[in-house]
Amino acid sequence: MSELTRTKVLFLITKSNWGGAQRYLYDLATTLHLASFEPVVILGGTGELTQKLESAGVRTITLQTLQRDISITKEIGFMTELWRIIRTEKPDVLHVNSSKAGGVGCFIGRLARVPRVIFTAHGWAFNEDRPVWQKFIIKKVHWWTVM
């Protein structure tokens, strides 16, 4: 197949440490048939996942604004950067992993008209110990992402 017919899959995950969600994403990105698919991974930080993906030949894009903790200025920066990347990369599929990447990724992916957006939950942030108002917002965002 030629480069033009490969399906571009843009993966998004919040953290680049090595854990369950990261291992899942690594397995998906590194086992795609490269003649048919072009995997690109967007992640926060330069941890072990980044190193493993790059060693396996998977292109990564690191965002310093993509962090687990909530910060309005970082969220705006993250959304802006993600919008720019999606518009530049023009993925056929956006595969988002984890709560934060899932909520923001689905929202921006829909705005940018990505043909297919897939969300994989690796735990529910609204079950964590956090203020009630955050749990409420997180539940609403999760509801919206699956619709």
Predicted region positions:
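Short active-site oxyanion
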Residues: 37-40, 92-94, 147
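Active-site proximal beta-strand in glycosyltransferases
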Residues: 9-10, 93, 109-124, 142
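Nucleotide-sugar donor phosphate/pyrophosphate-binding loop at the beta->alpha transition
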Residues: 73-80, 115-116, 125-147
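N-terminal strand-loop element at the rim of the active site
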Residues: 3-7, 11-74
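Short His-centered aromatic/hydrophobic patch
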Residues: 96-102
